[in-house]
Amino acid sequence: MFNRIAAYFSSPFTSLIFIGMMFLLPLTLPIHGLPLPDFYSEWIAAVMGLMSFLVFLSLYYWQHIRVSRFSLIYIGLAIIIVAQWLAGMLYSMQMSLLILSYLLFAFMLCNLAVYLKQNLGLERMALFLAKFLVIGGFANAIFVVTQLAFNAGITIPYMTKWPTYGIIAQNNHFANYMAMATASLIYLYAKNQFSNHKFWLGLLAFLTTIAFSGSRSTWLYLISFACIAFIFTQNAKKNHTDENQWQQILKISLVAIPLFALIQAALFYSIPDLIKLPTERLLSNSGNQSNSIRWAIWQQSWQLFLQHPWLGVGAGNIRWQSFLALNSPTLSSTGLVFEHAHNLFIQQMAELGIIAPILTAIALWKWIRNWWAKLNFNLESGWLISLLAIIGIHSLLEYPLWYAYFLGITAFLFGLGEQNYTQFKIGARPSLLRPLVLILLLAGCINLTSMLVANIKIERWMFPSINNSLTREQQTQFTSDYYWVKNFSLMQPYAEFIFANAIEPSKDNIDKKLTIIESSLHNTTSFALVEKYAALLAAKGDYRQSAKIMKLAILMEPTLKEEILVIVPTYADEGHRQELLNLISAELNDDKLNYHKN
């Protein structure tokens, strides 16, 4: 009995089922809390990925191991992270381990795809996974209809107003997923999985749903479909591979572009107050491209790279470094503090240095070259490259690969299309390696369980800590939960953010308070925390550093200048308050400021 159960869960098809759930569940899970709105989506993606790794317990896997050469990029990036860690560039060991666990997750998924393709075949896998994406697309379409009805004034039990449309509650992620669902719908139609009227109704529903995302990238996704379809149609004629189907797909992709425009026009004139359309956003921003926020972020990230070209500013440090750079004469004076460069390669350059984007570019070039060399222009290959094109476009404009659900999907798709791998046999008995795999899987289970418990604790104290509404009894439990999260999970940076918000600026344990707040500022640079940091520095007597932090806070939030100039000096010793104001006056090149005792 046990052997049959073990054989089932370690079979390739069962693994594929879990991968299908990884394609579906994270982006159809309507649970979003603070401070990490995507935690549960990322967590369920990691759980499904971990369950799919049970196939590595199979003896058959270890008899003929194939390692994707593309997957080595994740090892290369991990080495850079370790080098930064050893160099003392990373502010948190837990954050470092969390990043390394993401890279290990991607490495294993990439190689899992190679193994599953070897056993199940690309066509069977593509058909199976495309159905999960289409189901996810319809789930989002139904949810958007429900949201629209609620926003129009219809009372729906348990429904609350969300800032955006779509289950994932993030416009660009929503558009990405719906574009992948649309590509999968077209692929399944070409494989005769849908009748004509069901397909066109589905396409109309998906394009309408995409319009509700408001993402300008949707136009790029649709154009990429047409370009891929054109290239495959031309080559399919030469190779006599799915020629009729590709001609049909080309017509559909060309029709989809004007159809998408007509859908937006209809929505604009029927419900203008309930939706912000992609084309509307595109036209409203077309005359201000050079001054856009994204362009400013790219410029500042480039300057950070030039200042730290070899190892970057450190993984996860770009927010803190962009804050410190507000006073730099080499950066544009936009007052921007940001967590990501909104471009994969620029982000890698800024945080990891020049080696990371070079490794990534080489890995991508070799993967594309080998994939193209052995391409037979079938429908499955077109579906695969369409999904990767969507994620690629998104990665050049935002940061989807920093989320476990998109990272997992991307790594698996690269493994699915891998044509270049290293095959070797294990000299010793393969059964000896299975306990090691089991230990790794158990470690993953423990890690995910501890992170779930930690996030529940963090969410519990989120608002009481920010509002400073903790009672004496709650303070004891709050402190206990903080140390539990810090010591037994990888969620320390987020726990520190909650704990830092509850800290009262005073001289009690001041060095410890400063350490916690400074570490928290690497993760979340809010004005309230910066103000508290400056106040603690003033209380400690470090007036020069306090003045510098006050200046950066004012550059970040000019409208709150008066607030920080009034509040922070009150924490300095009474005889030195004017000294602090003189220092900040010198920093700001402002008229002399005077302290007035209330």
Segments from the language model and where they lie:
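Short aromatic-rich membrane-water interface segments that cap or initiate transmembrane helices
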Residues: 34-35, 91-101, 160-174, 286-292, ...
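Transmembrane signal-anchor hairpin modules in multi-pass inner-membrane enzymes, especially those
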Residues: 1-98, 105-111, 115-127, 131, ...
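Transmembrane alpha-helices of multi-pass inner-membrane enzymes
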Residues: 49, 223-229, 379-432
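Alpha-helical transmembrane segments of multi-pass inner-membrane proteins
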Residues: 5, 19, 25-28, 46-57, ...
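TM-adjacent membrane-interface loops and short helices in multi-pass inner/ER membrane proteins
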Residues: 170, 295-338, 345, 352-358
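Hydrophobic alpha-helical membrane-interfacial segments at the cytosolic entry of transmembrane helices
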Residues: 131-139, 241-269
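Flexible juxtamembrane loops connecting transmembrane helices in multi-pass membrane enzymes
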Residues: 225, 249, 260-298, 456-469
